[in-house]
Curated annotation (Swiss-Prot):
SMART domains: BACK (SM00875), BTB (SM00225), Kelch (SM00612). InterPro entries: BACK, BTB-kelch_protein, BTB/POZ_dom, Kelch-typ_b-propeller, Kelch_1, SKP1/BTB/POZ_sf. Residues 133-235 form the BACK domain. SUPFAM superfamilies: Kelch motif, POZ domain. Gene3D superfamilies: 1.25.40.420, Kelch-type beta propeller (2.120.10.80), Potassium Channel Kv1.1, Chain A (3.30.710.10). GO terms for cellular component: Cul3-RING ubiquitin ligase complex; cytoplasm. The keyword Repeat applies. This is Kelch repeat and BTB domain-containing protein 12. Transmembrane segments: none annotated. Signal peptide: none annotated. GO terms for biological process: proteasome-mediated ubiquitin-dependent protein catabolic process. It comes from Homo sapiens (Human).
């Protein structure tokens, strides 16, 4: 009768076998082969080597010379890596670190130990930074590890400005260096950094590298270099740049700089990064094109070039069902908050505020960042690396009540903390950040004094939050109590645009749609009026803005011209230059959705975005 061993007994059986093999190695029992690397000898067992390594299995079973040799010499493999791999075979422990991971990976690759190589590869990916990505890239290329090569190349190009400051880049060969500085894909904002890098690389070994200087200078886009920087480089590197060919290259660059219209050099990736208006939403009908559906995309606009782009919508896949609000953090991370999709809600016990962030390079998708206790009509703000969910309407004991609670989320620590509450309960308010302080503006606040009237009053209050003190203070009030307005920060001043409201404190007087622009100066704690909008305009959501600031100018993307939510929205983009104090329509019939939700401003690269469909571009009509 056969008795099968299962579960814990089977595990114990395997453990016993491993322990006995370990003991045999330690006692040098039944040793039948010795590996030699860098002169160091490693007694071991052919059976163990063959079990873990197809390379050794083939060596010991295919009639090769080593079949009958007691000693096998391993060339181009370090003794340390052999020791690490044998320890893994006999002890089930892989001891890798930053110093040895490449040599261990190389040995594992040589011995065809795929599991070990995969662990080493993951370790290098997880520990990649600006100081080592270049070495990882060339290592991966050398052994043909495509995944690692692709990942390290993306990291290298994306972080090239930081990589260029490390010693590792000064050690690479001239052909490798040339390939790098030729690339259009380097994420650098100024060509001066490439010129500086070329001179540092040559100076690192003048005797051998000066001969390559002319060839290297030809790859620097000198016409993009500031003339004063170029003159300074000449003065500091007289001995290097005195070669006649170098002088010709530099003189031609000076001539080209004076007449830039005659030249059209390719910009590098980082030079194309610019501030864009992002109208992020998830209208399921979306923009329809003969070529494809843009329902899963959100509208982007470059006010400088007047070009349109799209990014993926946070509704893609099983993302957000509704986008309620958003914010762009100090480090340019794009955040949106809303409610889960219907399919996702059906599988959840509790309804939450779902918060997502966008990956903008190489992985154009939204990922879930965190969730917060469910509420509606809240505001979302940020200071440094922290998010703040402020006020809103919460369900408490089966009643929807407006709250004053404020929750802070640390992206770095991945935790929530309740901070000092608002001085009053608020919903449908807005929040902006100026000089590392939050400013909460307008909204609704409940009133209990007059039960026969509206249950809520509009607020004209401005509240300031100082995170260093965890304290709120009341600042100068607005002229109008309002909600459904848009906000933006221009030149460190807060602009509040349009909305529904009434003059002064809301005491039940008639409310109307506003074309009013109110501007707050945080330094002086005072408000002034700006130029009225061309017509009364409401934001597209009660707690989100459809305005943003780019290069010191204010832009409003669409909006409602009346209080009826069912009206067709305006598809115009308005521009206000604070110096001219006048509104201009800069685009009409733009390719935004019939209904979008949140307007944000972020620095993005058009290369990472989705171009508009050609048939809709033809239909579009811009000023």
């Amino acid at each position: 009768m056969e008795c099968k061993i299962e579960g814990k007994e089977k595990y114990q059986h395997s453990l016993n076998l491993l322990n006995k093999i370990q003991n045999m190695k330690e006692l040098a029992e039944m040793i039948d082969v010795v590996l030699t690397a860098e002169g160091e000898k490693f007694p071991c067992h052919r059976l163990v080597l063959a079990a873990f390594s197809p390379y050794f299995k083939a060596m010991f079973t295919c009639g090769l010379l080593e079949c009958n040799q007691r000693e096998v010499i391993l060339y181009d493999i370090t003794a340390e890596s052999v020791s690490v791999l044998l320890n893994y075979m006999y002890n089930a422990a892989l001891e890798i670190n930053n110093a040895n991971v490449q040599t261990v990976a190389m040995a594992a690759y040589f011995m065809q130990m795929e599991e070990v190589f995969s662990v080493c590869q993951k370790y290098m990916m997880d520990h990649m930074d600006a100081s080592n990505c270049l070495g990882i890239y060339y290592f991966a290329k050398q052994i043909g590890a495509e995944d690692l090569s692709d990942r390290s190349k993306k990291y290298l190009y994306q972080h090239f400005a930081e990589v260029s400051l490390h010693e590792e880049i000064l050690e690479i060969e001239v052909h490798q260096f040339l390939t790098l500085i030729k690339s259009d894909d380097l994420n650098i904002s100024r060509e001066e950094s490439i010129l500086d890098l070329v001179l540092r690389w040559v100076n690192h070994n003048k005797e051998l590298r000066t001969v390559h200087l002319v060839e290297l200078l030809k790859q620097v886009r000198l016409e993009l270099v500031n003339p004063s920087f170029l003159r300074q480089a000449l003065r500091r590197n007289t001995m290097l740049l005195c070669d006649a060919d170098c002088v010709d290259i530099i003189q031609n660059a000076f001539k080209a700089i004076k007449t830039p219209q005659q030249h059209s050099l390719n910009l590098r990736y980082g030079m194309e990064t610019t501030s864009l208006l992002l109208c992020i939403g998830n209208n399921s009908s979306g923009i329809r094109s003969r070529h494809r559906s843009y329902g899963d995309a959100s509208f982007c606009y470059d006010p400088v070039s007047r070009k349109t782009y799209f990014i993926s919508s946070p509704k893609y896949g099983e993302g957000l069902g509704t986008v309620c609000t958003g914010v762009v953090m100090e480090n340019n991370t794009i955040i949106v908050a809303g409610e889960a999709s219907a399919s996702k809600l059906s599988r959840q016990k509790n309804k939450n505020v779902e918060i997502y962030r966008y990956h903008d390079r190489g992985n154009q998708f939204w990922e879930k960042l965190c969730t917060a206790e469910f509420r509606e009509l809240y505001a979302l703000g940020s200071i440094h690396n922290d998010l703040y969910v402020i006020g809103g309407q919460m369900k408490i004991k089966n009643q929807y009540l407006i709250t004053n609670c404020v929750d802070k989320y640390s992206v770095e620590r991945d935790n929530w903390k309740r901070v000092s509450p608002l001085p009053l309960q608020l919903a449908c308010h807005a929040v902006v950040t100026v000089n590392n302080k939050l400013y909460v503006i307008g909204g609704w606040t409940p009133q209990m004094d007059l039960p026969d009237e509206e249950p809520d009053r509009l607020s004209n209050k401005l509240l300031q939050y100082d995170p260093s003190q965890d304290q709120w203070s009341v600042r100068a009030p607005m002229k109008y109590s309002k909600y459904r307005f848009s906000t933006a920060v221009v030149n460190s001043e807060i602009y509040v645009l349009g909305g529904i409201g009434c003059v002064g404190q809301d005491k039940g007087q008639v409310r109307k749609c506003l074309d009013v622009v109110e501007i707050y100066n945080p330094d002086g704690d005072f408000w002034r009026e700006g130029p009225p909008m061309p017509s009364p305009l409401l934001s597209l959501r009660t707690n989100s803005t459809n305005a943003g600031a780019v290069d010191g100018k204010l832009y409003v993307c669409g909006g409602f011209h009346g209080a009826d939510r069912h009206e067709v929205i305006s598809k115009e983009i308005l521009e206000l230059d604070p110096w001219e104090n006048q509104w201009n329509v800069v685009a009409i019939n733009v390719l935004m959705h019939d209904s979008y939700d949140v307007c944000l401003v972020a620095r993005m690269n058009p290369r990472d975005l989705i171009p508009p469909p050609s048939d809709l571009v033809e239909e579009g009509n811009e000023h």
